[in-house]
Amino acid sequence: MRLRTRFILIGLALLYVSCFSTGKRREKVEFERVEDEGKVNYVEFKEVFPEEPEIKVGIGRGREIKIKTFGKCEVVDGEGKKLGFSEGGITVSPVEIRKKLIKHWVIIERFLDREKAIVYKMAYPDYQILKLGIYPRYFVAIGPFDKFEEALRFKHPNKKAVFSILEKPSDGKLRIPELKTTLISPIEILCDSFGYKNNKYLGKMLVFADEESGLILVNSLKFEDYIKGVVPWEMSASYPVEALKAQAIAARTHALDVAGIKWHLLKEPYDVTNDFTTQVYRGFTNYRVIDSVVESTRGLVMMSGDRFSIATFFMNCGGSLEGGEEWGDTLIKPKADAFQDLELSVEMLKIKKDTSFACSPRDSAPRIINYGAGSFRWEKKVSLSEIGEILRKEFNVDIGMVKDIKVLKRSASGRVKEVEIIGTKGKYRVKGDWDVRRSLGNLKSSLFVFKKSGNFIIFRGGGWGHGIGMCQVGAAVRALKGWKYEDILRFYYGNVDLVRIYR
């Protein structure tokens, strides 16, 4: 591992040298778009859901929410009162908001199987079993506690985490002037379709009173319609079909894995967000190719035994893929994103463009793919004063004037896992991919080397994103070379099972 990391560091460091020539000129090979609709191998069926599930997506907040409505519509309030209205639009604003109820739990153990959770609990009759998520997971817990601090202070030898869970949303009264009425929160709006902030939505809209933001707007819809609204925002619809299929399966897997489970979602009246904290969703689109790839992979997810794969993805890995161990996925291994079985070495990384890597394609690749390939190698100049300001504003830490930085830990892929920032008033250590990148000026990735130049740090690195899971540019180039989506997925996620969990 140390030797591999050393190779990566040397390779990135040599990006400082002048132009490097490989000597031989390679024959230009044109790419072809692969549109094969052949059947996938090794798919099993496991009826996790008797029918296609629904998902609730948080899409808006504010003191006033305006929704365009299309077709015959109906609104139902929290007490069951129904009002019909014709298309046009409605405006919702809060009249009265009452406090929501959040309870806090100490998590002792987690199970995928309900029967195993029940057996475990038999030895602890005072414990509770919490069922969470669209794809349910069962948590044996102690509680509830009224205050988070109480749960945090509670000591137990098997304590895994503290969950803050929404027991009852804020309620109150909501005004809709177009209907000349006031209704009890939450309200459910049913129409043929909706418009909100220049996007079109299917399913139904839910509006909740909320004591912090005033209102929360939630789009509740069928799961496959949700995936159709995710894929074109996470991967260009111009990408090859097999790459888009891989993206659809990854997006479906990721959503089911985190929906209603990810810690910051437990306090909300929805399953997932519409931004990058889960995955980007912008509602209904008119891309036929997206509809086709989602429908052709309907219900398909990646699983390892009874659990979902860690189906994360990102734009470009810089030629080096991160392992998934720290996220709990041992199938995802650190390796080169190359077409041969190659060890990462100085020969691969000392030039700015190397077509040995899937994420560094030839110039003849489609323009949209070369756009993503542009982050294969990058450079950024950040002032020491800017780093100090980031620490003060975003980390609530003041170490005075920043003088230098020092890398304390790298992963096997070469990514920085821990950095020490040195100032006139002290030192501060930052851990983790996202926080390291954020603290040093929002770097594209943590795969970098640097040098100090006066009052600046010059970073030179590779890739865009965390590096765990599927490299989207690499997936596109593999598809252009004829790879099928199942092969793309197994390269990036390991020996996963492709399982259809509903018809």
Labelled PLM ranges:
Residues R2-R503:
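Conserved, single-site charged/polar hotspot
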